[in-house]
């Protein structure tokens, strides 16, 4: 009688964490493999996922020399009041907008840099 994948998964689900760790160690010894190799492969996939980033954060690292123009640009981009925009501009580095599209992030960066700010897109 052979064991199906579903039966193996059910057995894993019923095991404690320590039992799973011991099983993995036994499998490493029996088959001459290492679980660390799987971690490296996952790390490679994470790099590919990072290339497909769809949401970006616009971070102002410095307001530069023309603080008044930067405050106006921050107000226009965020819709904040004068006091809040001034506080934000003076609190750099600070995220001006988070989770925006690449196009919106680049447009905001262009506007803030035109006002004299130093901006990064993350």
Swiss-Prot record:
Keywords: Ribonucleoprotein, Ribosomal protein. This is Large ribosomal subunit protein bL12. InterPro entries: Ribosomal_bL12 (IPR000206), Ribosomal_bL12_C (IPR013823), Ribosomal_bL12_C/ClpS-like (IPR014719), Ribosomal_bL12_oligo (IPR008932), Ribosomal_bL12_oligo_N_sf (IPR036235). Forms part of the ribosomal stalk which helps the ribosome interact with GTP-bound translation factors. Is thus essential for accurate translation. Belongs to the bacterial ribosomal protein bL12 family. PANTHER family: 39S RIBOSOMAL PROTEIN L12, LARGE RIBOSOMAL SUBUNIT PROTEIN BL12M. Pfam families: Ribosomal_L12, Ribosomal_L12_N. It comes from the Bacteria. It comes from Shewanella denitrificans (strain OS217 / ATCC BAA-1090 / DSM 15013). Homodimer. Part of the ribosomal stalk of the 50S ribosomal subunit. Forms a multimeric L10(L12)X complex, where L10 forms an elongated spine to which 2 to 4 L12 dimers bind in a sequential fashion. Binds GTP-bound translation factors. One of its GO terms (molecular function) is structural constituent of ribosome.
């Amino acid at each position: 009688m052979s064991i199906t994948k579903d039966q193996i998964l059910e057995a894993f689900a019923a095991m404690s964490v320590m039992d799973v760790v011991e099983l993995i160690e036994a499998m490493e010894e029996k088959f001459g493999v290492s679980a660390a190799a799987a971690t490296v492969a996952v790390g490679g996939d994470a790099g590919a996922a990072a290339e497909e980033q769809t949401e970006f954060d616009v971070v102002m690292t410095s307001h530069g020399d023309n603080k008044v123009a930067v405050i106006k640009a921050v107000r226009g981009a965020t819709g904040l009041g004068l006091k809040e925009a001034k506080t934000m501009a003076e609190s750099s580095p600070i995220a001006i907008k988070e989770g925006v599209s690449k196009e919106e992030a680049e447009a905001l960066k262009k506007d803030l840099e035109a006002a004299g700010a130093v901006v990064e897109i993350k």
